[in-house]
């Protein structure tokens, strides 16, 4: 069982994801990040479309949407809806929630998510049984997201 010093559990994948597009609802992510506009009091909803490769016990491609909400108090809430397509042709639904913490003075966020994986595939039935915690970083300037997931 592979372990990370800061996280318990078995490491089941590492992902290198790209932010392929952003849908905004009245205020753009760029305007917020550059300081042109503040996050409105009611918050800002952004749909982040992601796609990329994952390696590990669960290897393949992940693509989907994070219905992200930037709050006026600085917190970022995550609402993940992703499809995992394994290298051997199976599909796994990934849903999750969590939060991201912006770093001061740089376009980076630290990501903390609570993940649920579900599938009817016999070969991957093991993903249905356990909780997954993931941690990572997002570089909002380059659109690169790196996440590592641990089965509890």
Residue spans of the language-model regions?
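Beta-strand-enriched cores of mature, soluble protein domains
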Residues: 1-152
